[in-house]
Amino acid sequence: MQIPFSSSTSSSLGIEWELQLVDQQSRELRGEATLILDELRAKVGEREAAKAKHELFESTVEVITGVCGSVGEATADLAGTVSLLRDLAERRGVGLMCSGTHPTSDYAGQRITDDNRYSRLVSQMQWLARRLLIFGVHVHVGVRSPDKAMPIMNALMVYIPHFLALSASSPFWLGGDTGLASSRSQVFASLPTAGLPYPLEDWPRFESFMETLIAAGTIETIREVWWDIRPHPNFGTVELRICDGLPTLLEVGAVAALAQCLVDRMNTQIDRGYRLPTPQRWLVQENKWRAARYGLDAQILIDDRGGVRSVRDDLVDLVEDLLPVAHRLDCAQQLADVLVILETGASYTRQRAVARRADGDLTRVVDTLLEEMNTGRPVVAG
């Protein structure tokens, strides 16, 4: 089975941001996506409206950038679409926010979007699909050829805990504290074609694996492989999908800058004849769990002998190491915002601080998430 790979400009960028539609009175999720997207289409036309689309549930809208040359261009693109959606949503008494899970809303009461693809998913996966009331951020970074896509995907696996710890924003599920920094990552990983990617050596092996999955009836198309990192042949990108939903544009930009810089550096290393390392899958699995459980306080394994290091310290060093790349890509400020997240705390920390101050009232957490979306910056607990 041959899978064409659409070559794209190296280090070009695209971002997908899954937003929650929240009733401003009850603070619960509200299924208004079809109405809001229809109004957006009528207001700005099909081309611009294509930057916002349905997801599995009617209480979700995904905002998508075009192909961008820089992180600044991508976040400005997102901001423009979010502004249009916010105006339309607020007329209906609906607010926009983002976190890996809604703190209180129950998946059991959510309407599934009327779409054959989603109907098939629910029919096949049943309860696993019906509870996918989760929200993420996906970052696409362009690569020129499939020969680079697989080595870069494999090498990026070592950074899965870093991205998850930075973005972790789902401590609450159905009104209770899960004890995790990211419950979303654990919910999503329950799907048989989600979770960690398999370290396939090259593009022919990827093609062969996809052919096997289709022949076995596991998937109908390769779009149904939802790995934490995956190649996207249609876009000519490596797509990082591990991140929880990020509440602010500042955090979206920081994560996008980190992804762009890492892929750009790996692309350069391949051009110079360097063979990118592929981490052992068990080690990545353990580190992913540690990041999901402890967030930025995780101690991640750094070798196969049990050596560990703080993911926080690793991120500080990584930002410093990547700054020359970031300056060249014009995303040094956004990369430095990784350090802002380390200082203010990732969203799971901020949410818990709000809940503690409010004696466990999670509607106050929702209010803070709505505020963060509106201001574009983290609200620091005082």
Curated annotation (Swiss-Prot):
GO terms for biological process: modified amino acid biosynthetic process. Belongs to the glutamate--cysteine ligase type 2 family. YbdK subfamily. It catalyses: L-cysteine + L-glutamate + ATP = gamma-L-glutamyl-L-cysteine + ADP + phosphate + H(+). Transmembrane segments: none annotated. Keywords: ATP-binding, Ligase, Nucleotide-binding. Coiled coil: none annotated. This is Putative glutamate--cysteine ligase 2-1. It comes from the Bacteria. ATP-dependent carboxylate-amine ligase which exhibits weak glutamate--cysteine ligase activity. The keyword ATP-binding applies. InterPro entries: GCL_type2/YbdK_subfam (IPR050141), GCS2 (IPR006336), Gln_synth/guanido_kin_cat_dom (IPR014746), YbdK (IPR011793). GO terms for molecular function: ATP binding; glutamate-cysteine ligase activity. Its EC number is 6.3.2.2. Pfam families: GCS2. HAMAP family: Glu_cys_ligase_2 (MF_01609). The lineage of its organism: Bacteria, Bacillati, Actinomycetota, Actinomycetes, Frankiales.
